């Protein structure tokens, strides 16, 4: 019995390790892509940021509207002071999108006009195995609302 258990472990352990190594590789690649994408956004390279969108996102948004939205958002945020990577994880399936390679990334960012901002990104690989933005979201506490709450 011990020999059978040992044999099973020897057969499946390399596969599990191999799988974990690839997940970490995907997370590293996706994080590098997101860092560059956010840099384009923060440096007003909005066309490059739009090109980082996945084709599925581009179906529902044109470049002019997206670039205008980027400009408005960065005007609201101000200059980036710092950004810290908080969370990353890999997922092989997303409801409505199906099977694929997806990485979820969360950052804590500090902008000139926004003291504390959480930025959330979902990236997926396209048909050419390139990472592309599927979703970008953010949240922050509005200082004006905070002042009203304290009254």
PLM ranges: what are they?
Residues 31-32, 47-100:
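Short solvent-exposed beta->alpha transition segments
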Residues 8, 38, 55:
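Generic anion/oxyanion-binding catalytic loop in active/binding sites
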Residues 17-43:
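Short, low-complexity N-terminal intrinsically disordered segments enriched in polar/charged residues
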Residues 89-151:
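Exposed beta-sheet edge and beta->alpha loop/turn motif
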Residues 1-21:
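Bacterial Sec-dependent N-terminal signal peptides
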